[in-house]
Amino acid sequence: MWNRLYQYNEEERAIRIKTYFKFLFVREPLKRLLSAYKDKFIGGDAQLSRLDRRYIINKYRPQDLNKNENFVGFAEFIKYFSEDIPRNQHWRQYEKLCHPCLVNYTFIGHLETMAEDAPLLLKTAGIDDRVTFPPIHASTNTDEVLEYYSQVPTEYTKRLGELYRSDFEMFGYEYLGAVKPLLRHNTSKEDNSNR
């Protein structure tokens, strides 16, 4: 239905990059990773994550590989991700996936403020009189983020922060902001245990 940019020759790509209305919606990195995990490992397309599941189980629980046990917990997924950085479009850094430093996007919106950003996008594109956005509902709340990331050792959460640092900085997200309360709590627990 849609051609991808790489399907065009260099000249055709340059014309499209220069003349097309280009927009991008981004999401807070840690929330995006949680959403991808839930979609690919809890629900969604089991075939898509089958190889990832087998790899993770083989790496961290090889004794379970040939059993019927194929559930991958969030902490296992994060450990795998922070050590191996799989090249999957659902969790790859925006910097590498969308190339915001190379493409001059006309509009960049945030998923967290999509209800406000979507009408502005349509107005900027000059189509607000012909198109409307459907109602938008937030999909990942703060309590859920904290619940999932509380299962993850602090060192891996911090490693994720470094992997996604450019996404935090480029798009105005507070560095590790979604899990700051958790990190403060874990740091104070570590400080108390060292006394």
Locate the predicted segments by residue.
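Membrane-interface amphipathic segments in extracytoplasmic regions
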Residues: 1-195
